[in-house]
Amino acid sequence: MLQQESRVRVADNSGAREILVIRVLGGSVKRSAGIGDVVVATVKEAAPGGTVKENEIVRAVIVRTKKPTRRPDGSYIAFDENAAVIIKANDNDPRGTRIFGPVARELREKKFMKIVSLAPEVL
């Protein structure tokens, strides 16, 4: 679970390496973000020459969390790091062209099909 001021690694090739969560979207007082939730964030660390620059405000979807997420069958899924993919402001398509590392199956249920199709592995 991620909240305001959480630092998250970026799992795509948009140019950003790390983002800081500003706000969790959805609901009037939603405090924490899990897998598949959209957040507004600022880029804290970026690669030179990338499409995303430092201090830019972006939207991102959470694709991996350290906190275990419970699935309907009773199993849990957890990852070694917190990671997000930067998406376009007007739709749910990623700004990068590649996704690094596995993503959770919950993204398919939340209609992030482009991210699921680009990911090397869906767990």
UniProtKB/Swiss-Prot annotation:
Give the SUPFAM superfamilies listed for this entry: Ribosomal protein L14
Q: Which UniProt keywords apply?
A: Ribonucleoprotein, Ribosomal protein, RNA-binding, rRNA-binding
Q: Kindly give the InterPro entries that the UniProt entry links to this protein.
A: Ribosomal_uL14, Ribosomal_uL14_bac-type, Ribosomal_uL14_CS, Ribosomal_uL14_sf
A single GO CC term, please? Answer: cytosolic large ribosomal subunit
* GO process terms (BP): translation
Q: Which GO molecular function annotations are given, in alphabetical order?
A: large ribosomal subunit rRNA binding; structural constituent of ribosome
Name one matching Pfam family: Ribosomal_L14
Q: Which SMART domains match?
A: Ribosomal_L14
Q: What does this chain do?
A: Binds to 23S rRNA. Forms part of two intersubunit bridges in the 70S ribosome.
Family the UniProt entry places it in:
Belongs to the universal ribosomal protein uL14 family.
Q: Which PANTHER family match?
A: 50S/60S RIBOSOMAL PROTEIN L14/L23 (PTHR11761), LARGE RIBOSOMAL SUBUNIT PROTEIN UL14M (PTHR11761:SF3)
UniProt subunit comment: Part of the 50S ribosomal subunit. Forms a cluster with proteins L3 and L19. In the 70S ribosome, L14 and L19 interact and together make contacts with the 16S rRNA in bridges B5 and B8.
Know the name of this protein? Large ribosomal subunit protein uL14
